[in-house]
Amino acid sequence: MKSSIFVFSVVAANLWSAVLSANAQVNVTQEHNNLSRDGLYIDAAFTPSAAANLTRDLNFDGTISGNVYAQPLYIEGGPNGAMIIAVTESNNVYALNATTGTVIWQRNLGPPVTSGLPCGNINPVGITGTPVVDLASRSLFFDALIDGATKKHFIYSLNVDTGATNAGWPVDVNATATYNGMTFASLVQEERGGLALVNGIVYVAYSGYNGDCGAYRGWVVGVDINNPSNVHAWATTAFGGGIWGHGGVASDGTNMFVVTGNTFNTGGNWMGGEAIIRLQAGPTWTGQPTDYWTPTNWFSLDNTDTDLGGVSATVINVPGATPSQLVLALGKDHNAYLVDRNNLGGIALPVAQASVGGINRGTSAVTYHTIQGTYFGFHNDAGTIAAYNVTASNPPTIVSAWSMNQNGRGSPWVTTTDGINNVIVWVAGVAGDQRLHAYNGDTGAVIYAGGGTNELMSGTRQWNTGMVARGRIYFGADNKVYAFRLPTGTPTPTATATATATATATSTPTTTPTPISTTTPTSTVTPTPTATPVVSPTPTATPTPTARPTPTVRPHVTPRGRPSPPPRPGVR
């Protein structure tokens, strides 16, 4: 056992040192930092002792306008210096100075939808899912629902340094997304999950609205970022099958993975719901058992609204296990499932399954490695954050590691100083105590218990997750991006003298885009983004660091029996 742990740690350490040396510039370009949606941030400043003394940066302004469900992004390498990108339900997009929190540029894409939707629990609806940035072209991609005579989803591309709309964008999803004769209907489709950029194609996943109203489907739309008129899509055959999780589309770098929810009126014939779906570039889908997995009781899950797709897909590797390349799903049925991502298996038993207690929905999970092994972690509706170990065996098994009570409904994220050491699991008590919390990745011992008066946030929204860059944590909330700092954070880099040239031409922005109803997407004319003068905020008192909480003893987790699911859980 000791030799296997040593081999694992040496391999992992070499891997992460290569990663760190190749990425001296820090950029957080997407949901949960990586395509795998593991939520892992490598930052040498985040030792347990430093994390215990995290404080809010009261000199960081962070003022924005609108409700926030999306994770902020962190972008370096441009003429403005390090930037925070934030998007809101008011269809506002912001670039903020990463040190001061003042506005560098701001765009409004048009009115959000405030009424006329058949159901839902987000109001207004504008930009919900976390954007993605292509560093090579310095382009920012996101989906916005814009009100008008016809309510429509548009996929946008902006120059991340100026806010100008790139040529050929936005893409009218109503007009361009089709699959096997089915057409996209924005009125009943919600876009919650983070966008993914894989090999030059940006992927956007869609669900329905809370309440399961209207003839919605689970959709994945792919747009070629160098030729936005080239649009492909996949959708569930049956109505329903929404892709609900905050992580949206996950990828192993080649294939894309999504998890779908319950479908309707199938007559017992599987039509894409309650499943892990593997999509190839485009997206395209073979329909073969290698490219989908659904549990043998999928029809029962359909009938009781206990979606397999409560949490977005997470790609997970388990060194020493057979199979070792897996994908994780966490459902509203209280279960965790692991399947072989190279051969999903069709309607079949999973590689591993465990009852993990509590309904899991709307969030993202995390995965991480320590010297002790491989873990995944998540927050559930029962008010607990938990971690499970995945054994390096044939086949792998799922074993409870720790579970802690935590008031909120956020998606966790993970920091580590080098990839395997000093692993800390973080979560915000969104729609709960509205504070940050941190736990030892191996034991669950409390490292940070929310701080003092200054560390209280307000207006945090369900499912949301934080982001880490250069010794800081950033978190988006209603009308505000919050910044938290360690006692000795990594200095923020200065601006790059010359901006990287974009791969595509940009249009000269003028007036606010008006959604169009034509069948061909066109480049819209947009307002000239002006840099807001950077005004130094009024200095405020430096917060007193909170005392480091005494770590708690590793809890003993009692396995929970699987209860009968409620007939229709109220909130997705």
Report the location of each language-model feature.
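Positively charged n-region of N-terminal signal peptides that target proteins for export
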Residues: 1-5
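Flexible internal linker/loop segments at domain or repeat junctions
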Residues: 384-407
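Ser/Thr-rich, Proline-interspersed low-complexity disordered segments
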Residues: 488-570
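C-terminal segment of classical bacterial N-terminal signal peptides
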Residues: 13-23
